[in-house]
């Protein structure tokens, strides 16, 4: 996961 993923959320972070 990246910083952007964390900001967007876990669901999107998994992608």
UniProtKB/Swiss-Prot annotation:
Designated name of the protein: Peroxidase 3
Entry superkingdom: Eukaryota
Protein EC: 1.11.1.7
Catalytic activity: 2 a phenolic donor + H2O2 = 2 a phenolic radical donor + 2 H2O
One GO term (biological process): hydrogen peroxide catabolic process
Top EC class for this record: oxidoreductase
Function: Removal of H(2)O(2), oxidation of toxic reductants, biosynthesis and degradation of lignin, suberization, auxin catabolism, response to environmental stresses such as wounding, pathogen attack and oxidative stress. These functions might be dependent on each isozyme/isoform in each plant tissue.
Gene Ontology molecular function, alphabetical: lactoperoxidase activity; metal ion binding
Keyword Transcription listed: no
Keywords: Calcium, Heme, Hydrogen peroxide, Iron, Metal-binding, Oxidoreductase, Peroxidase
Cofactor binding description: Binds 2 calcium ions per subunit.
Cofactor: Ca(2+); heme b
Similarity comment: Belongs to the peroxidase family. Classical plant (class III) peroxidase subfamily.
């Amino acid at each position: 996961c990246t910083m952007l993923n964390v900001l967007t959320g876990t669901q999107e972070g998994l992608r």
